[in-house]
């Protein structure tokens, strides 16, 4: 009878590494406290792992975020946590999400939901006690797999099967699911690049393109956040190799002109690229010698600090590059005036874009990663006391001239050189 019931409810019992890793997750994190708090709240209360953490365990990936689903309403979740002295925040109460913090671990606990109204950006929901209905509102089959803490799966749309076969399938009608939240266009691309072992379904690609204008309804922050996740993928190289994926992302981000760069990386370049962040990846994509990067920065909400970082790279490569452009002397100037990050970005940019591995660039990168910014040995106090230069415009001018000479001379300057500048 139990086997029949398990089949009816789409359950899979103790599936090898899955159950072992789920149990390990319960053992190695404080999530057990949350399971106990919810499961013992009432006779029918229940909580399960859901979404990314289950997907990653099935796929033998490291789990970073732990999401949980429960049939308790948010107020009941708060009562259960409070009763067990578990710290929590009502971060998304309207959408049924409570965030719990235990020993520096963060857990998001979300009540089962049904969509009442969607507008392409957000959903108005009502709370539910129906696990199947909660699953049916999710985007892809691989994201609606639930598990109890013993590794027993609830998988109503056969997400495990799709994950193992490398299919990225929407739950239900793709057109309907996309119109509920247009961010799913980018999410589809991210999951395809990361998990697909198949070619794109022509039906899905067609529906994605038909709905592409809906992207304009989304905030720039949500779009950039999803782009960051794509750039973090270990399978990013696939983006430049798969024409349909490349065409799709260019419809959303037309300023990403240099996607093909990821298909031409040797082992050294791939290793170097791993050490870089989203802003550097973005620079590689949008800097092309035109005003393309300016337009992207105008459209999207990039911090002033990161805008400056991209502009330093852009301006550097808009200048004519000579045989001594990447000399230590030239790099020292950038290092002193713009900072370590600017030098590393410029050297990395050149190395990734170069057709062949350049040992000089590699050695310069190693040098500047470990180099501390030097401090000019001559200050205003010395000029005033030793050389009797009064405070004022002349003092500032001489100090700047000395600084320029010191930087141009690889951060060295003699007393005679200082005297020569003062006597000009």
Segments (PLM) and residue ranges:
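Catalytic cores of the polymerase beta-like nucleotidyltransferase superfamily
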Residues: 1-424
């Amino acid at each position: 009878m139990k086997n029949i019931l398990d089949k009816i409810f789409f359950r899979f019992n103790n599936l090898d590494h899955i159950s072992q890793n789920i149990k390990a997750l319960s053992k190695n994190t404080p999530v057990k406290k949350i399971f106990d708090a919810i499961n013992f709240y009432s006779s029918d209360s229940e909580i399960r792992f859901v979404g990314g953490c289950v997907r990653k365990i099935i796929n033998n990936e490291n789990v970073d975020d732990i999401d949980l689903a429960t049939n308790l309403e948010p107020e009941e979740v708060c009562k259960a946590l409070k009763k067990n002295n578990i710290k929590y925040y009502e971060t998304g109460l309207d959408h049924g999400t409570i965030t719990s913090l235990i020993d520096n671990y963060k857990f998001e606990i979300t009540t089962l939901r049904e969509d009442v109204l969607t507008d392409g950006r957000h959903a108005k929901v009502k709370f539910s006690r129906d696990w199947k209905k909660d699953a049916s509102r999710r985007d892809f089959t691989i994201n609606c797999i639930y598990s109890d803490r013993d590794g027993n799966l609830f998988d109503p749309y056969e997400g495990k099967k799709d994950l193992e076969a490398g299919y990225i399938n929407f739950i239900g009608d793709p057109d309907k699911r996309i119109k509920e939240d247009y961010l799913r266009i980018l999410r589809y691309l991210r999951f395809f690049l990361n998990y697909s072992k198949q070619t794109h379904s022509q039906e899905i690609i067609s529906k994605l393109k038909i709905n592409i204008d809906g992207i304009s309804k989304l905030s720039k922050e949500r779009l950039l956040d999803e782009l960051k996740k794509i750039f973090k993928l270990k399978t990013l190289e696939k983006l430049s190799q798969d024409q349909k994926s490349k065409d799709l992302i260019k419809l959303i981000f037309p300023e990403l002109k240099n996607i093909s760069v990821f298909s031409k990386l040797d082992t050294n370049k791939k290793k170097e690229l791993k050490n870089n962040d989203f802003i550097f990846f973005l620079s590689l994509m949008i800097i092309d010698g035109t005003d393309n990067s300016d337009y992207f920065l105008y459209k999207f909400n990039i911090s002033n600090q990161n805008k400056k970082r991209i502009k330093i790279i852009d301006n550097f490569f808009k200048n004519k590059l000579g045989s001594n452009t990447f000399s230590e002397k030239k790099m020292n100037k950038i290092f002193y005036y713009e900072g370590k990050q600017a030098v590393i970005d410029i050297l990395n940019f050149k190395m990734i874009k170069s057709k062949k591995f350049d040992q000089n660039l590699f050695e310069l990168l190693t040098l500047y990663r470990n180099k501390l910014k030097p401090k000019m040995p001559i200050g205003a106090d010395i000029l005033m006391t030793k050389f009797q230069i009064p405070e004022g415009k002349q003092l500032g001018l001489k100090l700047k001239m000395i600084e320029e000479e010191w930087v141009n001379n690889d951060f060295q300057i003699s007393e005679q050189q200082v005297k020569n500048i003062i006597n000009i």
